[in-house]
């Protein structure tokens, strides 16, 4: 036979602090306000956010993307570095939307935890707002889920959702890519948000022998450097040049992501050494003891976005991107595929 206490139980007693949630919303509102842009009719606070597609689009096609930050979050927990993973969250989705030729319009986030720490959550959302601001998209809504017993104390998970628009006639499909086209690579800012399960093993293996700095940055900062946001610079290049295809280099690296935008019967031949390997990736490769093939299939290995253009437009496109602030390398050409792999590095 069981007995129950006569004391009343509140939602807070059960582990859900509504007041903390309300306090977080008040912290978020001014951050979200800074991201507002044309098209926002109603943002944070309502049951649903409202967005009107800008009238300058004649035949708008909506493009959606969703992603997370993966096990990079484990380092954020261990090192108490929460202010940049929100940028990662935005970048993973808006860069994906971008490769269709689309302009990101708005973003929503999902933050889940076992016990809500308002300061930690506000730091994360501050990063999300910064990522949206840098991408020109509005943070118009989100969900904060406090779920006692679902996550260890001090841990959380993130998911992001982006929607963009592109003129129907300007959707990038890669179907016009052909042999002779040039492959440009835009430098990454670091590991970005993929491969961190292996990164964490490398940190564990290195122990106290890990370097103090990598590429001029403190070790932890180098690894937590947020995913580069390519949106504004690449949109400017798209407006000025006939770009044929874009590929966001995420999980699977160069070897798995470039083929996603290549027509059947074509392959990308990348020239080894045509872009520099940073200290960060050299350290990861040496510590893990893996070959070049595995590096290019696990990490972005220094190239975060690939741009495919006609050879006649390659120099002008590269100049536009460089002038905007990108590090651009001519890393290869498109060739007939034959019997080989879709991406060959050699």
Curated annotation (Swiss-Prot):
<dbReference type="Pfam" id="PF00586">
    <property type="entry name" value="AIRS"/>
</dbReference>
<dbReference type="InterPro" id="IPR010918">
    <property type="entry name" value="PurM-like_C_dom"/>
</dbReference>
<dbReference type="InterPro" id="IPR016188">
    <property type="entry name" value="PurM-like_N"/>
</dbReference>
<dbReference type="GO" id="GO:0004641">
    <property type="term" value="F:phosphoribosylformylglycinamidine cyclo-ligase activity"/>
</dbReference>
<dbReference type="Pfam" id="PF02769">
    <property type="entry name" value="AIRS_C"/>
</dbReference>
<dbReference type="GO" id="GO:0006189">
    <property type="term" value="P:'de novo' IMP biosynthetic process"/>
</dbReference>
<protein>
    <recommendedName>
        <fullName>Phosphoribosylformylglycinamidine cyclo-ligase</fullName>
        <ecNumber>6.3.3.1</ecNumber>
    </recommendedName>
</protein>
<dbReference type="InterPro" id="IPR036676">
    <property type="entry name" value="PurM-like_C_sf"/>
</dbReference>
<dbReference type="GO" id="GO:0005829">
    <property type="term" value="C:cytosol"/>
</dbReference>
<dbReference type="GO" id="GO:0004637">
    <property type="term" value="F:phosphoribosylamine-glycine ligase activity"/>
</dbReference>
<dbReference type="GO" id="GO:0005524">
    <property type="term" value="F:ATP binding"/>
</dbReference>
<comment type="pathway">
    <text>Purine metabolism; IMP biosynthesis via de novo pathway; 5-amino-1-(5-phospho-D-ribosyl)imidazole from N(2)-formyl-N(1)-(5-phospho-D-ribosyl)glycinamide: step 2/2.</text>
</comment>
<dbReference type="InterPro" id="IPR004733">
    <property type="entry name" value="PurM_cligase"/>
</dbReference>
<dbReference type="InterPro" id="IPR036921">
    <property type="entry name" value="PurM-like_N_sf"/>
</dbReference>
<keyword id="KW-0963">Cytoplasm</keyword>
<keyword id="KW-0547">Nucleotide-binding</keyword>
<keyword id="KW-0658">Purine biosynthesis</keyword>
<keyword id="KW-0067">ATP-binding</keyword>
<comment type="similarity">
    <text>Belongs to the AIR synthase family.</text>
</comment>
<dbReference type="GO" id="GO:0046084">
    <property type="term" value="P:adenine biosynthetic process"/>
</dbReference>
<keyword id="KW-0436">Ligase</keyword>
């Amino acid at each position: 036979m069981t007995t129950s206490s006569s004391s009343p139980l509140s939602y807070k007693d059960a582990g859900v602090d509504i007041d903390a949630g309300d306090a977080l919303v008040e912290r978020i509102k001014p951050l979200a306000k800074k991201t507002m842009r044309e098209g926002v009719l109603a943002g944070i606070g309502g049951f649903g956010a409202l967005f009107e597609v800008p009238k300058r689009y004649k035949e708008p096609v909506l493009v959606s993307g969703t992603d997370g930050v993966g096990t990079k979050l484990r380092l954020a927990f261990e090192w108490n570095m929460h202010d940049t993973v929100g940028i990662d969250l935005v970048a993973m989705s808006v860069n994906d939307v971008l490769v269709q030729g689309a302009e990101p319009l708005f973003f929503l986030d999902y933050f889940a935890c076992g016990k809500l720490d308002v300061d930690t959550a506000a730091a994360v959302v501050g990063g999300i707002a910064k990522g949206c601001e840098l991408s020109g998209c509005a943070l118009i809504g989100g969900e904060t889920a406090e779920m006692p017993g679902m996550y260890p104390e001090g841990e959380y998970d993130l998911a992001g959702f982006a929607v963009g628009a592109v003129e129907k006639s300007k959707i990038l499909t890669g179907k016009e890519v052909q042999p002779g086209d040039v492959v440009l690579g835009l430098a990454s800012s670091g590991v970005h948000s993929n491969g961190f399960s292996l990164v964490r093993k490398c940190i564990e293996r290195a122990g106290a022998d890990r370097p103090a700095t990598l590429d001029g940055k403190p070790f932890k900062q180098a690894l937590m450097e947020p995913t580069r946001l390519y949106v504004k610079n690449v949109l400017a290049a798209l407006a000025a040049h006939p770009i044929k295809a874009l590929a966001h280099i995420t999980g699977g690296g160069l070897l798995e992501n470039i083929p996603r935008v290549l027509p059947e019967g074509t392959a990308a031949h990348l020239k080894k050494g045509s872009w520099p390997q940073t200290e960060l990736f050299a350290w990861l490769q040496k510590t893990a003891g893996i070959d070049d093939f595995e590096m290019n299939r696990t990490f972005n290995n220094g190239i975060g976005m690939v741009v495919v253009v006609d050879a006649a437009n390659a120099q002008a496109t590269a100049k536009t991107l460089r002038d905007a602030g990108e590090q651009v390398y001519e890393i290869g050409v498109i060739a007939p595929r034959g019997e080989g792999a879709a991406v060959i590095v050699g």
